[in-house]
Amino acid sequence: AFLCGWISFWATDPPSISIMALAIVNYLAFFVPIHGLVLKLVAVVFVLIFMGVHIRSVEGGGKFQIIITALKILPFALVIGIGLFNLQGDILLSSAPLKGYATGGIAALIAGVATTTWSYDGMGAACYMSGEIKNPKKNMPLGLILTAVIVLALYAGLTFVASGILSIDEMATSDAPIALLASKLPGIGQYAGTIVAIMAIIVVIGSLSSCIMFQPRIEYAMAKDNLFFKSFAKVHPKYETPYFSIIVQWAVAIV
């Protein structure tokens, strides 16, 4: 745990913040031409905004996460809902093997586990906030269980729909399989690029906000236990948030 905390601060958390901020602006470039230094400056603005939100209020940051999470679910539900009525039986029931890839055995199992594990990897992040949650003994298990069920349903539904509309080779070779799936759905096909770009922006904004919210709590908790620099245990006198930890992580992410 000690090593994980230090690695998180120096090697994983700030880079993930910067990568997500840049990803948001890259998706925005689908609508507005943004390049070079301007792109990076806009990414910095996004980080600054969420830093301010999460320093100012834990409750306000939590409410924003609820809103952005609801907005994340809606487009997935739309694609799944329309897709279920447009499944192609011959594709869904096809047993054609994937060319050039392992189709069975330990190699295929490892590849599948690696991919799906990454998709569910963020679940533990909710526990970082347990010290600031009302009635955590009840709400933490409930939140983790409901989150797992909802995410599993969305992922399974999206995978099922994609498997009934896209061939296995299309899914394997496409750089943007969700965009390809949306392009084949009636009613939204002609707007697939726009819809997927908006979906991506919403999803990454939610991820960026949550990372800025929960990641500094690792260093904050370690500092309280004298396992990290003591200054990271500072709490804002008015907002009661670990402002120093949030600010330093923001600064490292921008660099």
Named regions from a protein language model:
Residues 4, 38-46, 71, 107-111, ...:
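Alpha-helical transmembrane segments of integral membrane proteins
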Residues 25-32, 88-101, 168-176:
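Membrane-interface helix termini and inter-helical loops of multi-pass transporters
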Residues 1-47, 52-55, 60, 201-221:
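Hydrophobic transmembrane alpha-helices that form the core helical bundles
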Residues 46, 82-83, 99-162, 190-212:
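Hydrophobic, membrane-embedded alpha-helices of multi-pass small-molecule transporters
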Residues 38-89, 103, 144-148:
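Membrane-interface loop-to-helix entry segments
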Residues 15, 49-57, 75-86, 157-161, ...:
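Residue-level signal for alpha-helical transmembrane segments in multi-pass membrane proteins
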Residues 70-98, 117, 159-166:
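Hydrophobic alpha-helical segments and their helix-loop junctions in multi-pass secondary transporters
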Residues 1, 29-34, 143-209, 228-255:
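TM-loop-TM module centered on a large, flexible mid-protein loop between adjacent transmembrane helices
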